[in-house]
A protein has these predicted regions:
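Generic secondary-structure boundary/loop-capping signal
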Residues: 29, 69-72, 84-85, 153, ...
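Short, flexible turn/loop "capping" segments at secondary-structure junctions
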Residues: 78-81
Length: 177
């Protein structure tokens, strides 16, 4: 999906997560700054989301073809209202594959947005690496609440991982009134 701007892109990804699919969006520093308020929305609504930041050089539009690793503070602290978010950083193109899997695992296991940092070099580079056997990875199944639990539905109830239930809109018996 090609959105008209950065804000629409992240809001569409949040909508995908709200509907029961994992939303993913990407940009670089200036675009990540524009996505900041919506990141806070995803944190507040406890929706899984992966945000990829391919860092580039300079402030503002800067040097779009120059790589730089200067967005760490933006990734860690770049939201208002004490809105913490896990941040993962890839060290190579092959590592980006592993980091993406970890970002998805954290996002769905803890119902939170995750930032995946990369840079222009990693985003444009290639390296030989064997695609791993995915059956060797530990599964992290996504579980949706499909029926009203005993004692009623508590949207902000927590499990042993402090995760709230993920409910698809329109699930019978789990509708907001």
């Amino acid at each position: 999906f090609q959105a008209e701007d950065e804000i629409a892109a992240i809001c569409s990804a949040i909508g995908a997560s709200y509907a029961g699919s994992l939303g993913v969006t990407s940009s670089s520093g200036p675009g990540i700054a524009l996505k900041g308020e919506a990141m806070g929305l995803a944190i507040m609504t406890e929706l899984p989301l992966v945000i990829v930041n391919s860092q580039r050089g300079g402030p503002s539009t800067g040097l779009p073809t120059k790589t730089e690793q200067s967005d760490l503070y933006q990734a860690v602290y770049g939201r208002n209202g004490d809105a913490p978010m896990p941040v993962i950083s890839a060290r190579s193109p092959g590592d980006a594959f592993e980091c993406a899997i970890e970002a998805v695992r954290i996002a769905v296991q803890y119902m939170t947005p995750v930032i995946l940092l990369t840079d222009g070099y990693i985003a444009n580079a290639a390296e030989p690496w064997a695609v791993p056997d995915l059956t060797t990875y530990e599964a992290f199944p996504v579980e949706f609440l499909t029926e009203v639990p005993e004692g009623g539905f508590k949207p902000y109830g927590r499990d042993e991982n402090l995760k709230r239930p993920w409910v698809k809109p329109g699930t019978p018996g789990l509708l907001h009134r």
